[in-house]
C-alpha cells in the first residue's frame, strides 16, 4: 500500500476526521450551496432561501453519508454579511454536527462572517475559505479577532502554475502581492487546522500542476489536501464550445480520478450523488 514517509496530520472537526495516509480515513466531500443563481436562493442580499428545498439537498448528503461513510463540509457561499448570517443560522438549525465552509468573493462579507460565527458560538465548526494571495489586512485582522481556527489555504500562483510555483505561494511568499507565504499568514491568523487547496486550474492553464501538487503537499507538509477539481472542466473554455455535444458528458466527472491521488475534499451539492459513490468505490480500492 502506498504511504507517505512524512507524518500525516489528522484534523478533527467535532469527531469527524480529515487527513492521514491514503485510505486511513474516508474522503471528505464539499457540498457547495447558495452560490450565484442557486435554486434555493430567493434574495442574495438578505439571505432569504427556500428552506425546504435547501434542507432536502443537505438531507441527500446525510443519506449518502450513512450509505458510504463519507462525511461532508457544507460550503456556504454568500456575497453579503446579512446573507451569511441567514445561511449560517439555517444550517446550524438543521444540523448541529458537521462543519461548514464560509466562502465569498467579497472580503467584507467574509470578515463579517468571522465575527458572526464567533458571536453565535459556532466558530469551532466554521472553516474560512480561503487564505490566498488576495487576502487583505482587514480580513487577516478579522480572523485574528475571531474564534475561527480552521481555514482553506490556497496554493494559487497566477504567474507559475507548476508545482514549484504553487509551493512558492504556500511556503516561501513573495507572490501574488503578498510578502509572506500563505502558510505564514495562516499561522499569523491563528489557524490551527489548515487544509491545503492545490488551486485547480483548467486544462491548458496548469491543470497538471494541480494534480502533482496533491502529492507534493502531502509529502512536504503532511497536511490534509484537496481542491475544487470540478473547476478544471467548468472553467475550460474549449469544453464550453462543445456544451451542446456529448463530449461534455464524457468529461464532466473527470474530477473523480483525483481520488486515486490521495486528496481529501471535493465540491458541488447537485452532483454529490455521483461523486459520493465514485469516492467510496475508489476509497475501498485504495
Residue ranges and their predicted role:
Residues 2-19, 24, 36, 266-286:
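Extended, intrinsically disordered, low-complexity segments
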Residues 9-174:
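Active-site beta->alpha loop and helix N-cap motifs at the rims of alpha/beta catalytic domains
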Residues 139-286:
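Catalytic alpha/beta core domains of metabolic enzymes, predominantly
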